[in-house]
Regions:
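Feature marking well-ordered beta-strand scaffolds used for ligand recognition
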Residues: 1-175
């Protein structure tokens, strides 16, 4: 009776005369109790992604002011009962979070959700003028797009600029 709900990653709006700088407050993932479908109840917020130590911005929410690439939840691994080759764990959520990379969460306690691990691909080695979105300011950032997890624990991640990664959980994220 629980449902994971995302707000698609928001983006700053850029126009020929400049950008509109606006808050991106809704880049969240939520746990919602839907045991009564007429009264869904928010029971938890997923942890907001932390930036790595060497990240050039104080948080992911403001990075769009100086570089290309949105931030926010984009795609979740969605196991389906009729697909036995996909991981069917109910205690994990995998989310491609655009510029924040792939995030893996432990939802075994739906009221206290913990981030277990993350993967951030390297930034693409391309010039801003080679962008899919010409005219946007700053360097390009890696953006994870979609993810899927098979029954062996392999995580398949697509990225906007540089292709496809096959990852394997290890350590605490594998438990």
């Amino acid at each position: 009776n629980l449902c994971v709900v995302t707000n698609e990653g928001e983006r700053f709006q850029f126009f020929p005369e400049g950008s509109i700088k606006e808050a991106q407050a809704m880049n969240n993932i939520h746990m919602v109790d839907v045991s009564d479908p007429t009264h869904p109840t928010l029971i938890a917020e997923f942890p907001y992604p932390e930036v790595p130590e060497d990240f050039p911005y104080p948080n992911f929410n403001v990075m769009n002011l100086g570089c290309q690439g949105p931030f926010g939840p984009h795609n979740l691994h969605e196991p389906m009962s009729n697909k036995p080759w996909l991981e069917q764990r109910g205690d994990r959520v995998y989310c491609c979070y655009f510029a924040a990379g792939l995030r893996i969460y432990d939802v075994s306690d739906p009221y206290y959700i913990k981030e277990l691990a993350y993967f951030s691909p390297p930034n693409p080695n391309k010039k801003p003028e080679d962008s899919f979105f010409p005219g946007l300011p700053g360097p390009r950032n890696a953006m994870t797009e979609d993810c899927c997890v098979d029954d062996r624990g392999y995580i398949y991640v697509t990225c906007f600029d540089d292709g496809f990664y096959v990852l394997k959980r290890t350590g605490a994220a594998d438990n």
